Amino acid sequence: MKTFCIASALAVSLCLATFASAQSKNNYSDPKTWLCRPGGKDACDADLTTTIVAANGDLTVEKFATDPNAPIDCFYVYPTVSTDPTPNSDMTPDPAELNVIRQQFARFTSKCRPYAPLYRQVTLAGLLTAIPRATGLVGNPFASGVQYDDVRDAWNYYLEHDNNGRGFVLIAHSQGAFIATELIRREIEGKPVQSRMVSAILLGTSIHVPAGKNVGGT
């Protein structure tokens, strides 16, 4: 089926969203749909032992170890890194998606149980057309479409099958932070699960709060 779009960034964005929303849902009970889960031989399974260089030149090796008994969970939504040529990525992780886990998230496994779903993000190629450039257009460009739906479905699976009442931290960057912000707004804020949210580390985006306040509101 052909979809005809006018030649504007906004129209192309809407077409991509329509295309993405027609795709089938992921089954997040399948371990292959997760880049990281507790105890898995996956993208978080990395030796992050570090050599610390003191001001006087002394070297100290700091051994890295995960904590399988960590008291909280971390749920991570990674940034725009997919090199797939399509508007949205597929469910086969490319090297960039694996690398960003190691660079940004794996170290958190020393403090929390890791959960990082693979999701069909808007790719680097898709960004050329997926973000509206119209003057005055505001809002969250990733708040609808398969990229959001995947993360929401993974989150709901995690809550139902893995959380078991534990505290959690949301960690996200760039596109992931936009999605996580919307996830908080729709699925967490004002609901019982909010009491379990320890923190949200949302990098590469901004959060609106009520005038005169420094907390509250998404």
What do the PLM-derived regions correspond to, one by one?
Residues 1-4:
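Positively charged n-region of N-terminal signal peptides that target proteins for export
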Residues 7-17:
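Bacterial N-terminal signal peptides
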Residues 18-22:
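Sec/Tat signal peptide C-region and signal peptidase I cleavage site
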Residues 23-61:
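N-terminal module-boundary/linker segments of secreted carbohydrate-active enzymes
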Residues 32, 38-40, 67-70, 76-167:
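Active-site catalytic motif of lipid deacylating hydrolases and related acyltransferases
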Residues 101, 179-188:
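Short, well-ordered amphipathic alpha-helices
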Residues 150-164, 185-218:
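Surface cap/lid and interfacial helix-loop subdomains adjacent to catalytic sites
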Residues 172, 176, 180:
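Gly/Ala-rich beta-loop-alpha elbow adjacent to hydrolase catalytic centers
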